[in-house]
Amino acid sequence: MTSTSHFVASTVKKPRSRYGCLICRSMRKKCDEVHPQCGRCLKAGKQCIWKQPGTERKNKTKWRKAMQNNSIPIQDLADDFELDFPDTLDLTNPDALPVLGESIVNPISLPVDVASPFLPSECYPSKVELPYFPLLSKPNTLLSLLNDEEISCCEYYCYSVAPITTILPGQPNFLPQLLLPMALHEESVLYSLVASGYRLKYGNDNSLALQKSKVFVNRALLTLPERRSLNLSKSEFVVSLACYILLVYTEIAFADTTEWATYFLNAYNMINKMGGFKILKECSSEGKLLAECFAYFDILASQSNLNGTYYSISDYTDVYGVDELQLFESLENCIKPLVLIIGDIINLLVESRRAGFDDLQHTLNIYEKSQTIEGKIWSCVPQYEDMKSNKLDSEKSEPLQLFKLYKTTTEMYLRQVISRMPPVSLEMQVLLHKQTQLIDLLLESSLRNSLSFPMLIAGLNAATDLQRTNFKNRVNCLCQNYTIGSLKKVWIVVQEIWKMNQNGNICIDWYEVVQKFGWRLNTGV
C-alpha cells in the first residue's frame, strides 16, 4: 500500500484546490487562494503559509496506479519518491505543524488495510491525537528522505505492531505516541522504525527485506546523537535511548538471544554516563515512558536471574510512581506492579545464591524477605488509575484476566526459585491448574503477545504426560496465531528441562539452561 493512500479521503463532497494555503489544507477546509493572506486565515488571525512554486504533486498517473494496486513490491523501490500529502497537512513543512493547543489527526489513526502473515490484524488503533512532549516540541520532518516502500514499512510498524502491544482497550499506546513524532525529525529513530518495519512486515525469511533492515539499523546507529556528541543534552539522550529500546524490542520480537542484549547494554552504559537511572525522571514524559520499557526488559531477561537487575527495583519504582505515566500505555501497563514484584524475586534469588544457606541468620533473612514478597503478591491489585478508567470493570475483561494470570505466575515463580518447590508438589500443581485456566482464556485474545513469561513458568511445572501434551498444544495454538516473540525459544528451553526432569520431582533453574545454550533470552515479547 502506498504511503499516501492512508491520507486521501475516500469521498469528496466538493472539490478542493491543491494550491490552497497550508493552514486551510491542514484543517481540510476550502481555501479562496487569495494572496498573500487568504480569507480564512485573515479572519482567524493566522499567518498564511503557501507551498513553494514547483513543489506541487506530480506523476498523477503513477500515484493513481499505485493506489489502485494497493501495494508496491519490495523489489520495485522508487528511489526518486517525492513525499506529498494532498488535501491534508503538509508534514514536510515544519511551520505548518500545529503548536501546543492545536491538534491534528495522527496518520496512524486512519483506517488501513495491511495484510501480513506475521502479525494479527484484528485490532487497530483508534483515533488519537499526537501528544505534546516538551523536549521534542519543534519537529522538522525527515520523511522526504524515504521512498514509498520505506514509508510503508514505517507505517506498518505503527499500524500493526503498536495495537498488539496495547493491553487496555482504547488506551493510547506509547509506541506511536512517542516514536512517530520523534521519527519526523530524528534520523536515528526514523531509520530504526523503518528497519523494524521491514522485519515485522516481511519476516526473517525474506532475505531482501532482512538485508534492507540491516542497512537501516546501521544508518540508525551511525546517526545516533550519542555517536555525534560527547556531552548529550537531555533531548539527545532521550532520542538515543528511544532508538536503543526500539532496536531491543525488534530483536526480542524475533526471538533473538544475542543482539538485543548488546543494544540493551549500550543503553545502560549511556544512562550511567548521564548520571544513572533516576535522570530519566528529569526527562519529562518521554524519559519516563522509556524508563518503564527499560525496566520491563531488564526484569524479564534470563541473565537478570544470574546477575540481578541492572538497577535496583526501588529505583524503578521511584520512576514508575509518576502520575503522568497514566496518560499513555507502556508495555506492561496494568501488570506493572507484578512485573516489579518479579524483579524483587529475582534480586532475592541472586542474594540467596551468593550467600548460600549455611548461615542461619542469612537463611532467616531470606525467608522473611520471601514472606514480605508473598504479602505484596496477595495484596497486589490493578493500578488505581486503570480501575478508575472503567477499563477493568468487568470480571471477564481480558486485561483483568491477564492481571490474574501474572499474579498467579508471580506466586509460582516465588515458590519455584526461592522455596525450591518441585513441579510435582501439591501447591505448585494447584497453582498450575489455576494458571492454565487463565492462559486458555487468553490464547486467542488480543493479549496473547503477553504470554511468553507465563507460558515459560507453566511449561517448567508441567509434570505429567497429559500436562505436557496440553502445554505443547497451547504452544502450537499461539505459534499459529502469533509468530513473533520469544515463545519458540521458550518451547526449546521447556523441552530441555523435561528431558532433565522427566518425573517433575526436582526443581531446575530455567535460566541456567538458557546460559548453557549460550543465550540471553528475554520473555518481554
From Swiss-Prot:
UniProt xrefs under InterPro entries: Fun_TF, Zn2-C6_fun-type_DNA-bd_sf, Zn2Cys6_DnaBD
CDD domains: GAL4
Species the sequence originates in: Schizosaccharomyces pombe (strain 972 / ATCC 24843) (Fission yeast)
Compartments, record wording: Cytoplasm; Nucleus
DNA-binding region: 21-48
The keyword Transcription regulation is assigned to this record: yes
Protein name: Uncharacterized transcriptional regulatory protein C965.10
Biological processes, Gene Ontology terms: positive regulation of transcription by RNA polymerase II
Assigned keywords, A-Z: Cytoplasm, DNA-binding, Metal-binding, Nucleus, Transcription, Transcription regulation, Zinc
GO cellular component: cytosol; nucleus
Keyword Cell membrane applies: no
